[in-house]
Amino acid sequence: MLAMTTLDTLYPPTAPLDTPEHNEFRATVRRFVEEEVTPFHTQWERDGQVPREIWKRAGELGLLCLTVPEEYGGAGVDFSYSAIVVEELSRAGATGPIFYLHSDIVAPYIVQYGTEAQKQRWLPGMVRGEIIGAIGMTEPGAGSDVAGMRTRAEREDGANSPQGPGYRINGQKIFISNGQLCDLLVLAAKTDATRGAKGVSLLLVDTHLPGFGRGRRLEKMGLHAQDTSELFFEDLRVGADALLGEEGRGFVQLMEQLPQERLLVAIAAVAAMESAVIWTRDHLLQRQAFGAPLSDKQTVRHRLAQAHADTRVARAFLDDCLRRHLAGTLDTATASIAKFWCTEMQFRVLDECVQLFGGYGYMREYPIARAWADARVQRVYGGTTEIMKEIVARELFGR
């Protein structure tokens, strides 16, 4: 298990996450992870998902939906506290409880675009961990190409239905995190198939309604404790009050929220890098070769020194992005740089650490092996590296 005191010495909390209030909150999160997550994570990996009870426990401790206003049960604090939850889970290699998807991706859609009735219905339960949220964007034939999605939400006037006006949903989503557990899905669907991206709308779907189906739990290279699933919609009917925001504004809403999503991925990436360097350093100090610790070999020392330097640089850039986000000035291009650069660096650092572990680095009983496998998808979800670079290129060239 990672010695957190050692990690805090080499990678201490930095501004804007280093106030006494932040340190006190970090201690609470760390205690929760050490006592109620880490001892059970291997079993959750075998099960393919995290039990609902851990969500409720996180809710009891006030670790979910921290930025949700107090009138809906949240703490009403800023995003910096959410960043601490992401860091502590990632540092521990606890990639199963994907709280940030629920708290910092799904909940903000409702806070920002939801009606008062929608907020009252969904947010208190999400804060308590009784309602688990997910987001449905990706389809078998539409990943980065949101405009190409085929899931339809056809408007019905309700003249012949006792349920009144609403939408009838048909289609399929894939690679949906929290797919097996979710009670609420922020669904992106076409309400006007003739308008491309301008025909996309967001709807709040209660997954207990008739017509909603969960496919198999997908077997992944990594993230074994995260439930990732296919979802199906067959004549699923929701009321008109399920529309989130305005019809045809879904693509714009998704784009407005993506900078925070990409920053979350970058936060997890850098925290994982920091732990990987510590794990590798400790291994090199203990592992003997040719009568001396591997840490005495200059080539080995220099390779880990480079990984440490890369990690320090990533942290400095990430902290700058976090400060910008808290000030409301983090632009889309900078968030895209943070996402692709930090995740590319994460995989490079972790790959180097696996190499320095030798054969042990390929054994899943070692956290470095699991972290390496978990890291690979970071360059894919939340926007691929290639799409991130295209966003940056458009800013550079104006097109």
Segments (PLM) and residue ranges:
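Short Gly/Pro-enriched turn/cap motifs at secondary-structure boundaries
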Residues: 99, 126, 141-144, 175-178, ...
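A short, Trp-centered hydrophobic/proline-enriched beta-strand micro-motif
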Residues: 129-137
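Flexible, small-/acidic-enriched active-site or ligand-binding loops
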Residues: 148, 210-239
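Long, acidic (Asp/Glu-rich), low-complexity accessory segments flanking structured domains
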Residues: 231-253
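A short core secondary-structure module
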Residues: 150, 166, 170-214
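Short glycine/proline-enriched turns and hinge-like loops at secondary-structure junctions
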Residues: 77-79, 145-147, 178-182, 196-199, ...
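Helix-loop "lid/cap" segments that line or gate small-molecule binding pockets
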Residues: 104-113
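Alpha-helical interface subdomain recognition
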Residues: 2-92, 96, 113-118, 125-130, ...
